[in-house]
Curated annotation (Swiss-Prot):
Catalysed reaction equations from the record: O-phospho-L-seryl-[protein] + H2O = L-seryl-[protein] + phosphate; O-phospho-L-threonyl-[protein] + H2O = L-threonyl-[protein] + phosphate
Record function comment: Normally needed for pro-sigma E processing during sporulation but can be bypassed in vegetative cells. Activates SpoIIAA by dephosphorylation.
Lineage of source species: Bacteria, Bacillati, Bacillota, Bacilli, Bacillales
Cellular component GO terms, alphabetical: plasma membrane
Transmembrane segments: 40-57, 70-86
EC number: 3.1.3.16
GO-annotated molecular function: protein serine/threonine phosphatase activity
Protein name (Swiss-Prot/TrEMBL): Stage II sporulation protein E
PPM-type phosphatase domain segment(s): 355-565
The UniProt record lists the keyword Transport: no
Any one GO BP annotation for this protein: sporulation resulting in formation of a cellular spore
Membrane topology: Multi-pass membrane protein
């Protein structure tokens, strides 16, 4: 190509230079065919090309002249230092030096990016720790200390200039303190008027008892408001600390993923290269980062295939047979020119896939339901199923439940752990308004690699797993979100299998059947009697059965979500490569 372009440029200056173009093109072709001989092959290609072209040259251009010119070029080529040729090769697309230069540039950018992300991770971690240190996120003061602070503010306004101050607070401190503390508790409970004995004793003990009681009643309102504000500030700081810690972990994991280094797997690289080349595939370079089962990570540089999909249809199926893992193309960056190389990443596909079905109905057959549901496929190889039931019915309940699921989705997609996500949502719901906003949450996190499921049930009804004729109940005890500011999430773990059915429902379905004393036994029996394995049909049949027991009435919002776990079948079957099968082992 370089010879043709050079000869073409010469022909622009003089038409007679077309002869040189032919010579350079033919010599370049021979040099390319003899590229394994490196400098010797290139020299031999030029000399042979000159001899062959010279035999067909015009009379005014003899063979001797062409041969002298070619030998001169060979001598200059020999005198040219190797580092100059290498530097020139770096500028020519398609050469191994150019590709190596690009790889080094990419690695440099990768390392710089990873270091910056890691620095941000350390900053967020430091900020998180600063919120948990003394002075920012202290433990709550004890009740006795709070009472002491309150009574101190009361005495400043009542006893500070009283002539009996010395007698009450020096000689009879315990008696005075107990009287004022008891009055405070009675006022707080609204039962002071029902305790005349305490009022009489206070009148005998204090000359300003009426003023003391009035000040306590007045100050108690501000005291309660101040306590509530302190609790909200403390909870806000806790949320910030947890969120900063979560963000720090996500960024730290991201930095580790960027900075992943190649493992010392040269033998496996050569075996894979040989197997692919024996099949007729040309592979320029291969890098293995991991052959760990379930976490295979391989990168290759392959010639541009003009959109024929050779990586997906041939290389990935061969790797599947060689490694004993289901391998697919994770990312593909095609070459920008026909003779270039494509950068392809291969990795393990998910071992399982989830097929879902949903049945949904609003109270009274309306259009707005207080129930919301969501199915979220996360980047970490997990699949989330969630149902949220807002308090009551109608638009307000729909807003509560949909807001809960929207927050959950956004937090989970960042990679933050589900327990931290739920605690954060609970704190946000309890802090964002003075209104009572409660909502339940039924969350199932399915690991698509090993079929392990974590159930997080916040005030929700039981779920069921149907495995053949067996029905398994999943239940946990947690209050609805938004009631209390801080709580521990009870996580239930269950191992699912292929062809298992997971059935989740809101309370409108679970507690919906009329004239049924034991909802759990009734639901397990109905699920066990189902004759279909289609998730959508199961959701529809359960919904229909519950509505039939109520003579067609829908007295509450109703939602059923059904998920079926199945083995993941690759799009392309594996291509046998018996010589190196299971080399990863």
């Amino acid at each position: 190509t370089v010879g043709v372009v050079t000869g073409l440029i010469l022909s622009f200056a003089n038409v007679s230079s077309l002869y040189e173009m032919s010579l350079l093109a033919f010599s370049g072709l021979l040099g390319g065919l003899l590229k394994d001989g490196k400098k010797l092959g290139a020299r031999l290609g030029l000399v042979v090309g000159s001899l062959l072209i010279g035999l067909y040259a015009q009379a005014d251009q003899g063979l001797t002249t062409n041969l002298y010119e070619s030998l001169t070029a060979v001598v200059l080529f020999l005198l040219t230092p190797s580092f100059v040729l290498k530097n020139l090769s770096k500028l020519v697309p398609g050469t191994s030096e150019n590709m190596l230069e690009q790889q080094q540039y990419v690695r440099k950018i990768r390392d710089v990016t990873a270091n910056r992300v890691e620095q941000f991770s350390n900053v967020f971690q430091a900020l998180s720790k600063s919120f948990t240190q003394n002075g920012f996120y202290d433990e709550k003061p004890s009740a006795d200390k709070e009472v002491d602070y309150f009574l101190s503010s009361v005495t400043e306004r009542t006893c500070q200039f009283c002539f009996k101050k010395e007698q009450c607070w020096a000689q009879q401190f315990d008696t005075t303190y107990e009287y004022m503390k008891e009055i405070m508790l009675e006022v707080d409970n609204g039962t002071l008027e029902q305790n005349p004995r305490l009022i009489r004793e206070m009148d005998k003990h204090c000359v300003k008892s009426k003023k003391v009681i009035d000040v306590i009643e007045h100050e108690l309102t501000y005291f309660k408001a101040n306590q509530h504000l302190k609790a909200q500030i403390q909870e806000s700081r806790r949320i910030v600390a947890e969120q900063l810690h979560g963000v720090s972990e996500v960024m730290g994991n991201f930095a580790k993923e960027i900075k992943r280094e190649r493992e010392n797997l040269n033998v496996q690289e050569e075996q894979i290269l040989e197997a692919l080349r024996n099949f007729g595939m040309e592979i320029n370079q291969i890098e293995i980062y991991s052959l760990e089962p379930g976490n295979v990570d391989i990168e290759m540089w392959v010639p541009y295939c003009h959109g024929r999909g050779e990586c997906e249809k041939i290389i990935a199926p061969m790797l599947t047979d060689i490694l004993g893992e289901s391998i697919v193309v994770k990312n593909e960056e095609c070459a920008k020119y026909p003779q270039g190389y494509c950068h392809v990443s291969f990795g393990c596909t998910k071992a399982y896939v989830v097929d879902t079905g949903v049945a949904h109905a609003a109270k009274g057959g309306g259009f707005v339901s207080g129930d919301s549901y969501s199915m979220i496929e996360l980047n970490a190889g997990k699949y989330a199923l969630a149902i949220s039931d807002g308090m009551g019915n109608g638009e307000r309940a729909h807003y509560e439940s949909s807001e809960t699921l929207q927050l959950l989705k956004q937090i989970l997609q960042t990679g933050i752990e589900e327990t931290i996500a739920i605690k954060s949502i609970n704190s946000i719901l309890s802090l964002r308004t003075n209104d009572e906003i409660f909502s339940t949450l039924d969350l199932a996190m399915i690991d698509l690699q090993d079929a392990n499921v974590n159930f997080l049930k916040i005030g929700s009804t039981p779920s069921f797993i149907k495995r053949g004729d067996k029905v398994i109940k999943i239940q946990a005890s947690n209050l609805p979100m938004g009631i209390i500011e801080e709580f521990e999430v009870d996580v239930v773990n269950e191992q699912m299998k292929a062809e298992d059915l997971l059935i989740m429902m809101s309370d409108g379905v679970f507690e919906g059947p009329k004239h049924v004393e034991n909802y759990e036994m009734w639901m397990k029996r109905k699920i066990g009697e189902l004759q279909t394995n289609d998730p959508q049909e199961i959701a529809d049949l359960i919904m229909e059965e519950v509505i039939r027991t109520k003579v067609g009435l829908i007295e509450d919002d109703m939602t059923v979500v059904v998920a079926k776990l199945q083995h993941n079948t690759p799009k392309w079957s594996s291509i046998p490569s018996y010589a190196y099968r299971n080399l990863a082992q």
